């Protein structure tokens, strides 16, 4: 076994990512029973913090969270936070730290005072049960019908009777012979006046005679109050059923909602007054449970995190609201054979009428840039901020439901809510993603929720391994007598230096094992690694090889170590296709901004390849070879279009840490390629590369399509028939292909070559 020591001098660096990690998992143990213990611990660990003020103490399913805010010399609150999190036994578990370096000149974070307003509120009385008529969750989902209607006037849309549901046992208040929409959880109010709000119509208090039901339809304005009241009450009861009750209760007083609170096509949770004000422009928002529950999602955010502000919190809040609404629509349809538009948020309010605004819960092209702050409803580098957070959550919920059925809803919703507990001012998506994966592992260690979440967050670039090994070429060639050249790179992509690094590498097929150790690996370090390795006599040309790596490091010497595994796959020998490669050296134009408003014109490169007659049909041995270079692969989408017009995406804005990539895409390692089975090979094939982010350009070096006829495993260019090789590609493990760009490890002797990665900041 070789032992390789990385020296600090060999790993020169620049900062790769601008965003620092706010989550800290201390090595030391401490018992914290109350706010005084928490404050004493913080001041002992961070003596330079100065004066801290306790904002609040919150309890969640897994422990207690003490939220502190920094203050300046005048006692005014500053932007920043430190949250001390303990487990259920009061043992220190984690810190969230976004404290400013200096509070003398800090940016103030003053609480917003309640704006002047007047409300009409229902009276107190006796709690009784009533019957209501509602949309559950909306008329399109309830019926599975489009119901597009007349775009000019939504009031003319014909709603079938089957769109309405009768619900019973709903708690309301009885007073003086009438029933009002108020109970211990929800209060339907009427905003009569409010500063800085374009208030909606004054509908008064909705009530019915004792013994009657709230049986309205959408032609009655009272239906809006009833529908919103029901869905908000149902969701609040669901929170309690998940375990957020007693000392863990998120809401301790009735939540106020005005179903016609705004005269615009917009709804808002007013944080200063604690009121949900629903809009009436276009389709009245209260008719769509998605919109009601989305706004309720904002209220949940502020109850879980008292200083929900700064960083990516705006976009996270929008994404969580979409998720919370989508999860309920999914639950309503859980027993249906055919589910209606699961991946669409607001598919009633956002679809019908002249004012359309629906969002996707399945934006697989959304990618995260840690150097940017994500606001609400904005596009960053081609990614809508709301969808960037909702997509990994909702798609993991679908994955969980497919495996565990109805039980997955409660379990996964607990994970999502618990993940937010303990966050603080200035949280970034990668902070919350890490916390959510952590919550999944702690709540359900026997189920793969954490693994699934981790994979989806990595797909979107929200989570990234701080230390990765990457290969620029997936094929191992023969470089000398019984020798192959392994060329890889060790990349430190974190925002700060890593301590006590150890990488255990193993490639069993080559009888090779190494351990790489370093006390310090600086941020942004890229170390090129090359080694000639002997080829065992038993190795067959065309065989698939795996390189496994176990990685361990600490963010600093006072934190718990991070441990994870990576894997790379190689092919021994270069695959030979039935059709010759096209060597194009075609430039990939950079995207460019074309006006003052930040509108982006995509950069596009098209390369055609003609396959002559007699080439046969696409079969299971079909492959696409591609070699291209680009400083930032996350800018690129690479698609191949067959002569029939059917297309397959090879790279989809996925991050890749090296500037060059040569790979062979096969049925086994590329999702979607099997859709081309049976297609004629003859005709024009088109490679299309799209760049959606300004700042970098690249080049297509070569590409080709065809059946794999053999593997070139010699210096003379002879090839081996794939039918004679001993080991073939494993179709059960397509995620291990290097085309994923995720990177596993392979490292041999160290011939250091340092690449400086300059930090960048782009603004849209």
Regions found by a protein language model. Give the residues of each.
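Gram-negative bacterial Sec-dependent N-terminal signal peptides
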Residues: 1-17, 754-755
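Zymogen propeptides/activation segments of proteases
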Residues: 18-292, 299-320, 326-574
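Loop and turn regions of beta-sandwich accessory domains that flank beta-strands and are enriched
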Residues: 463, 538-540, 569-737
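Disulfide-bonded cysteine-rich modules in secreted/extracellular proteins
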Residues: 469-471, 582, 743
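Juxtamembrane/start-of-transmembrane alpha-helix segments at the extracytoplasmic/lumenal side
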Residues: 738-747
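A cross-kingdom C-terminal cell-surface attachment/processing module
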Residues: 746-764
């Amino acid at each position: 076994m070789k032992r390789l020591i990385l020296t600090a001098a060999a790993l020169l660096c620049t900062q790769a990512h601008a965003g620092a990690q706010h989550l800290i998992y201390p090595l030391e143990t401490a018992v914290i029973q109350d706010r005084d213990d928490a404050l004493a611990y913080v001041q002992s660990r961070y003596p330079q913090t100065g004066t801290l003020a306790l904002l609040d103490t919150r309890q969640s399913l897994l422990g207690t969270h003490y939220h502190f805010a920094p203050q300046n010399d005048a006692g005014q609150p500053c932007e920043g936070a430190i949250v001390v999190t303990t487990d259920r036994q009061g043992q220190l578990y984690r810190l969230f730290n976004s404290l400013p370096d200096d509070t003398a000149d800090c940016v103030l974070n003053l609480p917003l005072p309640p704006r002047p307003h007047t409300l009409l509120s229902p009276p107190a009385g006796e709690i009784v049960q009533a019957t209501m008529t509602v949309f559950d969750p909306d008329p399109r989902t309830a019926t599975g019908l489009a119901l597009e209607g007349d775009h000019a006037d939504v009031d003319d849309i014909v709603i079938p009777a089957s769109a309405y549901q009768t619900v019973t046992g709903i708690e309301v208040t009885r007073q003086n012979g009438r029933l009002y929409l108020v109970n211990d959880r929800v209060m339907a109010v009427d905003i009569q006046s409010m500063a800085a709000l374009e208030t909606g119509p004054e509908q008064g208090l909705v009530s019915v005679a004792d013994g009657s039901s709230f049986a309205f339809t959408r032609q009655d304005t009272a239906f809006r109050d009833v529908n919103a009241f029901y869905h908000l009450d149902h969701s609040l009861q669901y929170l309690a059923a998940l375990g957020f009750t007693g000392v863990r209760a998120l809401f301790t007083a009735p939540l106020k909602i005005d179903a016609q609170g705004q005269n615009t096509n917009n709804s808002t949770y007013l944080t200063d007054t604690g009121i949900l004000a629903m809009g009436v422009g276009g389709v009245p928002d209260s008719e769509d449970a998605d919109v009601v529950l989305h706004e309720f999602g904002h209220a949940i955010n502020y109850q879980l995190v008292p200083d929900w502000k700064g960083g990516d919190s705006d976009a996270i809040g929008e994404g969580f609201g979409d998720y919370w609404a989508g999860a309920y629509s999914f639950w309503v349809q859980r027993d249906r054979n055919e589910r209606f538009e699961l991946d669409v948020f607001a598919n009633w309010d956002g679809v019908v009428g002249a004012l359309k605004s629906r969002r996707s819960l399945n934006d697989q092209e959304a990618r995260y840039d840690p150097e940017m702050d994500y606001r609400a409803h904005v596009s960053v580098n081609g990614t809508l901020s709301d969808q960037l957070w909702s997509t990994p959550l909702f798609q993991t919920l679908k994955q969980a439901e497919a495996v565990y059925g109805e039980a997955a809803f409660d379990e996964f919703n607990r994970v999502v809510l618990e993940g937010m507990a303990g966050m603080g001012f200035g949280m970034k998506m990668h902070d919350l993603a890490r916390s959510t994966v952590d919550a999944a592992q702690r709540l359900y260690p026997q189920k793969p929720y954490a693994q699934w979440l981790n994979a989806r967050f990595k797909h979107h670039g929200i989570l990234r391994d701080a230390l990765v090994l990457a290969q620029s070429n997936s094929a191992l060639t023969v470089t000398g007598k019984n020798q192959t050249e392994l060329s890889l790179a060790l990349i430190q992509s974190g925002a700060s230096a890593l301590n006590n690094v150890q990488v255990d590498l193993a490639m069993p097929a080559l009888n090779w094992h190494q351990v790489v150790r370093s006390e310090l690996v600086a941020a942004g370090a890229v170390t090129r690694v090359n080694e000639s390795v002997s080829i065992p006599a038993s190795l067959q040309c065309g065989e698939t090889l795996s390189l496994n790596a176990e990685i361990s490091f600490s963010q600093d010497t006072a934190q718990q170590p991070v441990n994870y595994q990576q894997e790379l796959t190689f092919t021994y020998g270069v695959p030979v296709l039935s059709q010759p490669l096209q060597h194009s050296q075609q430039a990939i134009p950079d995207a460019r901004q074309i006006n003052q408003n930040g509108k982006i014109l995509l950069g596009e490169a098209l390369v055609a390849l003609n396959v002559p007659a007699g080439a046969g049909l696409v079969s299971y041995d079909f492959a696409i070879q591609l070699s291209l270079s680009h400083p930032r692969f996350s800018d690129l989408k690479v698609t191949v279009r067959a002569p029939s017009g059917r297309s397959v995406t090879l790279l989809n804005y996925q991050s890749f840490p090296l500037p060059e990539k040569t790979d062979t895409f096969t049925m086994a390692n590329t999702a979607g390629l099997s859709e081309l089975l049976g297609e004629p090979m003859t005709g024009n094939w088109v490679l299309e590369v799209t760049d959606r982010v300004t700042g970098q350009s690249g080049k297509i070096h070569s590409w080709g399509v065809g059946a794999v006829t053999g593997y070139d495993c010699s210096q003379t260019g002879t090839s081996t028939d794939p039918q004679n090789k001993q080991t073939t590609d494993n179709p059960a493990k397509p995620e291990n292909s290097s085309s994923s760009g995720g990177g596993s490890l392979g490292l041999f002797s160290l011939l250091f070559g340092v690449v400086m990665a300059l930090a960048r900041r782009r603004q849209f």
